[in-house]
Swiss-Prot record:
Annotated GO CC locations: cytoplasm; excinuclease repair complex
Helicase ATP-binding domain sequence ranges: 26-183
Region annotated Disordered, chain positions: 601-628
Binding of ATP, residues: 39-46
UniProt cross-references to SMART domains, sorted A to Z: DEXDc, HELICc
Record keywords, A-Z: ATP-binding, Cytoplasm, DNA damage, DNA excision, DNA repair, Excision nuclease, Helicase, Hydrolase, Nucleotide-binding, SOS response
Task performed by this protein: The UvrABC repair system catalyzes the recognition and processing of DNA lesions. A damage recognition complex composed of 2 UvrA and 2 UvrB subunits scans DNA for abnormalities. Upon binding of the UvrA(2)B(2) complex to a putative damaged site, the DNA wraps around one UvrB monomer. DNA wrap is dependent on ATP binding by UvrB and probably causes local melting of the DNA helix, facilitating insertion of UvrB beta-hairpin between the DNA strands. Then UvrB probes one DNA strand for the presence of a lesion.
Domain named UVR: residues: 635-670
Coiled-coil intervals: none
Domain notes: The beta-hairpin motif is involved in DNA binding.
Pfam families: Helicase_C, ResIII, UVR, UvrB, UvrB_inter
Motif (Beta-hairpin): 92-115
Protein name per Swiss-Prot or TrEMBL: UvrABC system protein B
Source organism per UniProt: Xanthomonas campestris pv. campestris (strain B100)
Length: 673
């Protein structure tokens, strides 16, 4: 373990990267608050940021616009910094239905959610790392601006253990229960502890693979040992260990009882208001719901929807922002906003949507007014809490350009020598037939094609039409969840189909080197989906292939089209000059086709494998030759693979399950051959 970032990479900065790294580092060390990295597709933006992190040696928070991109970034930074604390902080809900009331139909919708325990563990690990290590890099989504427990409470509750320290066993057990750990003598699970004589085993909530054994003798801590909770194997002995709370929302008994008193006062004031307005039903509803919650909090220290009382539990004043992940960041940290043209507007939108829903709940007596303070940060609050920042995008928005005040670092030259796609404009009247002939040409070359339309209906019709003409085509739309979307992109890269049709394919920002043609239908319909930024992003999807080409179907040249084409041409010229100067022959990017989400799971899967055991992800590797296996061997292998596939599905690791499913199908085919 080290307190310094150590970048591990087989290659050195090239192209525009050395100058970009030097400029970003110099600006950061000079105290510049905001700067922008304008990096084209395939220019090595992540690698450039990794070099900046290594040089500035500051705790870093990287924000991404969605879980898919966050997982990809987590995997990349994990490979760049294998010896440092790279963490993952996203929403731990697999499914979330917020509490809501629809006055028009008098319908109250109860909160309903499903929490992913593995992601919860990673969130706890992220906050612990930020509080305890300087070499911490956290990849997060917009989840970072939502309320967490106050870091002061989180720190004040922690249990610090040292060898030789005198501690009463009952006191130790009481402290663990204050941290919301549960006693379980039968099975040691995450967030639980067990007592066997003078030995206590604790499975820390933020750990996935290591449990702590506390051995006492006559009231003194004699030994602290980390061990594998699955095998019982001793991993290492320690002089000191800190146990952090099981949840970010843990608080002391005194704070809870104090909150009960202030909630009662607020309830009394609110009921007086409702009675004065003759809102008797609302008053009766609020009194009943709140009094039930108060009884639960007084008796067990918890109630369903306790987050709605967070203002009272944290001691904040009305209207004050809640504590968030940004409160866990040290003041000298570095903030990186990836795909800032998407992430920045997201941050601004979160507060307003949350506010309108909760105002209805308060108005109709389902919640106290203090529930309005359980919210994401407002945009200006987020700005005030943000440390020195770097905005990263191929198409920075007006906010980033304004805030950077001219400090824009360009990353236009690709070390691979790849030039931006050739852009052609063709008439709308024959766009579908022309597209079909282009698709057939690309299929002959073994390449893939992306097609973007303006509407869902048009995408569906085009998919159906292409399918009827024997083209293997799929359609990507907003109703498809993240996991399935990732699988579709993986299948495109694997060649299970050749054409992907969508409405807004630029949002993914994912690497697809097999795509050599991007077709933009109705490119002259000015608007959000055909703005300059959107066009540049979409054209960039073909920038990782040597034969990259973009076709814009349009009958007239719009300002957005002209600006996008001019910018693409400028970048092409700069890359061509660099290639001639350095004698570089462009090559297509060769990126292994793997599970995109594995970045956020691979580390845990490796740890689960434990010392001396094979890595759990190796089940997806294909044996050299199935034909060499006998019938009994094949039957045994099939059974083992099926068990692993179902376990991955149970753990919500759908891409890993899909990989094993493909392997099972190949094994079955081999056994029949």
């Amino acid at each position: 373990m080290t307190d310094r970032f150590e970048l591990v990479s087989p290659y050195s900065p090239a192209g525009d990267q050395p100058a970009a790294i030097d400029k970003l580092v110099a600006n950061f060390e000079a105290g510049l608050a905001k700067q922008t990295l304008l990096g084209v597709t395939g220019s090595g933006k992540t690698y450039t940021i990794a070099n900046v992190v290594q040089q500035v040696q500051k705790p870093t928070l990287v924000m991404a616009p969605n879980k898919t991109l966050a997982a990809q970034l987590y995997g990349e930074f994990k490979s760049f910094f294998p010896n440092n604390a790279v963490e993952y902080f996203v929403s731990y809900y697999d499914y979330y239905q917020p509490e809501a009331y629809v006055p028009s139909s008098d319908t109250f919708i109860e909160k309903d959610s499903s929490i992913n325990e593995h992601i919860e563990q990673m969130r706890l690990s992220a906050t612990k790392t930020l509080l305890s290590r300087r070499d911490s890099l956290v990849v997060a989504t917009v989840s970072a601006i939502y309320g967490l427990g106050a870091p002061e409470d989180y720190l004040s509750l922690r249990l610090i253990l040292s060898i030789g320290e005198h501690i009463d066993q009952r006191q130790l057990i009481r402290h663990l229960t204050d941290l919301q750990y549960t006693r379980n003598e039968f099975e040691l699970t995450r967030g639980a502890f067990r007592v066997r004589g003078e030995v206590l085993d604790v499975f820390p909530a933020e750990s996935d693979t290591e449990a702590l054994r506390i051995e006492l003798f006559d009231g003194d801590i004699e030994q602290l040992t980390l061990f594998d909770p699955l095998t019982g194997e001793t991993l290492r002995k320690l002089q000191r260990y800190t146990v952090y709370p099981k949840t970010h929302y843990a608080t002391t008994r005194e704070r809870t009882l104090s909150a009960v008193d202030t909630i009662k006062e607020e309830l009394k004031e609110r009921l007086e208001q409702l009675y004065s307005q003759n809102k008797l039903v609302e008053a009766q509803r609020l009194a009943q719901r709140t009094q039930f919650d108060l009884e639960m909090m007084a008796e067990v220290g918890f109630c369903n929807g306790i987050e709605n009382y967070s203002r009272h539990l944290t001691g904040k004043a009305p209207g004050e922002p809640p504590p968030t992940l940004f409160d866990y960041l040290p003041p000298d940290a570095l903030l990186v906003i990836d795909e800032s043209h998407v992430t920045i507007p997201q941050i601004g939108a979160m507060y307003k949507g949350d506010r309108s829903r909760k105002e209805t709940l308060v108005e109709f007596g389902f919640r106290l007014p203090s529930a309005l303070d359980n919210r994401p940060l407002r945009f200006e609050e987020w700005e005030a809490r943000s440390p020195r920042s770097i905005y990263v995008s191929a198409t920075p928005g007006p906010y980033e350009l304004r805030e950077s005040a001219g400090e824009i670092t360009e990353l236009v030259v690709r070390p691979t020598g790849l030039i931006d796609p050739v852009v052609e404009i063709r008439p709308v009247g024959t766009q579908v037939d022309d597209l079909m002939s282009e698709v057939h040409e690309r299929i002959k070359l073994g390449d893939r094609v992306l097609v973007t339309t303006l509407t869902k209906r048009m995408a569906e019709n085009l998919t159906e039409y292409l399918g009827e003409h024997g083209i293997r085509v799929r359609y990507l739309h907003s109703d498809i969840d993240t996991v399935e979307r990732v699988e579709i992109i993986r299948d495109l890269r694997l060649g299970k189909f050749d054409v992907l049709v969508g409405i807004n394919l630029l949002r993914e920002g994912l690497d697809m080197p097999e795509v050599s043609l991007v077709a933009i239908l109705d490119a002259d319909k000015e608007g959000f989906l055909r703005s300059t930024g959107s066009l540049i992003q979409t054209i960039g999807r073909a920038a990782r292939n040597l034969r990259g080409k973009a076709i814009l179907y349009a009958d007239k040249m719009t300002r957005s089209m002209q600006a996008a084409i001019d910018e693409t041409d400028r970048r092409r010229e700069k890359q061509v000059e660099y290639n001639l100067e350095h004698g570089i022959t462009p090559k297509s990017v060769a990126r292994p086709i793997s599970d995109i989400m594995e970045g956020a799971r691979e580390d845990a899967a490796e740890k689960k494998a434990g010392k001396g055991r094979s890595k759990s992800r190796q089940v997806a590797e294909e044996p050299a030759d199935y034909r060499a296996m006998g019938p009994a061997e094949i039957a045994g292998k099939l059974k083992a693979l099926e068990q692993k596939m179902y376990q991955h599905a149970k753990d919500l690791e759908f891409e890993a399950a899909a990989q094993i499913r493909d392997q099972i199908q190949k094994l079955k085919a081999a056994s029949l051959a």
